[in-house]
Amino acid sequence: MAINLGKDPNILILISFAEILFVLVPSLIAAKIEKNPFIVEVKELGFNVKNSKLKNILLKIFAGILIGILFFFISQLLLTFYMRFIIQSLFGAQFIEEGIGNAISTSPVNPNFIQLSLLIAIQIVIIGPCEEAFFRGFVINKSKHKVKLIYSIILSSFLFAIYHVPPFLVPLTTIITFFGYYFTFGILLSLVFVSFKSSLLPSSIAHSSLNILLLIF
């Protein structure tokens, strides 16, 4: 059975605030284990903008927007590639239909102007930054000191994909149908994060821009 979180835009808005836990929980746990102040752990996620020049911040924002737009244009190509050329070839069209039919939908149904504006603002302020803080800032930054960076990126992308097709909420058909799509975007966002020297700003803006474009179009 499909889970339609967007059926009531107001509920979708409220649920979105839960993503703040992606920042609070790992920071609290890390602060407890490593005996660091909570704020230090938050900054280590990539939120530290100390000594950042306005020009650099604006360049990162601009780069993030451009990358997000690029991601939007390749998103449908990626989805088509995985579904038609891989999943359908291996499991058949019926498998994909079941996978799509049981997916979690976060597309708001008939939102009014205020609801749509709030959802866009939430993408910018909460969804993008909080997901990037955990999957990139926390997972990559904490694991890269123990394993090779490539393994940190793979771990981050795997967790990112699993979060979007959670095994305890969707069937195996949905996981297999969409896993490659989300895993690929996990890799791409990780590369953005690493390329900008572990700054959350570009990957967060790219993530938010992609989500907003998918929300609108």
Predicted regions and their residues:
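Alpha-helical transmembrane segments
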Residues: 1, 8-24, 62-68, 153-159
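Juxtamembrane helix-loop-helix connectors linking adjacent transmembrane helices
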Residues: 5-11, 40-127, 145
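Helix N-terminus capping/helix-initiation residues
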Residues: 8, 36-37, 171
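Alpha-helical transmembrane segments of multipass membrane proteins
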Residues: 22-26, 67, 71-79, 156, ...
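Membrane-water interface of transmembrane alpha-helices
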Residues: 25-40, 82, 86
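Hydrophobic membrane-targeting alpha-helices
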Residues: 29-33, 73-82, 161-162, 191-195
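Transmembrane helix-loop-helix hairpins at the membrane interface
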Residues: 113-217
